[in-house]
UniProtKB/Swiss-Prot annotation:
Coarse class of the protein's main subcellular location: cytoplasm
EC number: 2.7.7.6
GO BP, sorted A to Z: DNA-templated transcription
Name of the featured protein: DNA-directed RNA polymerase subunit Rpo10
One Pfam match: RNA_pol_N
GO cellular component, one term: cytoplasm
Residues annotated for Zn(2+) binding in this entry: 7, 10, 44-45
Catalytic reactions of this protein: RNA(n) + a ribonucleoside 5'-triphosphate = RNA(n+1) + diphosphate
PANTHER family on file: DNA-DIRECTED RNA POLYMERASES I, II, AND III SUBUNIT RPABC5 (PTHR23431:SF3), DNA-DIRECTED RNA POLYMERASES I, II, AND III SUBUNIT RPABC5 FAMILY MEMBER (PTHR23431)
Disulfide cysteine pairs (residue numbers): none
Subunit and partners: Part of the RNA polymerase complex.
GO MF, one example: DNA-directed RNA polymerase activity
Length: 68
């Protein structure tokens, strides 16, 4: 799944900090600290980051597109 532009619950724009979140997560930082630094404060917005799958820097969408 491609990361959403807005939070599904509150509609806040969250995609603007996704690349930094992804980079810092890849570097081994704690996800809670990253979201705090990026000032993602609402639980609904934080859930969008926590539930988005990243395995070996690949998103679920990257796996699905191989079978189109």
């Amino acid at each position: 799944m491609i990361f959403p532009i807005r939070c599904f619950s509150c509609g806040a724009v969250i995609s603007e900090v996704y690349e930094e979140y992804r980079t810092r997560l890849k570097d081994g930082e704690n996800p809670e600290e990253i979201l705090n630094d990026l000032e993602v404060k609402k639980y609904c917005c934080r859930r969008m980051f926590a539930s988005h799958r990243l395995d070996n820097d690949r998103e679920l969408f990257d796996d699905i597109v191989e079978y189109k």
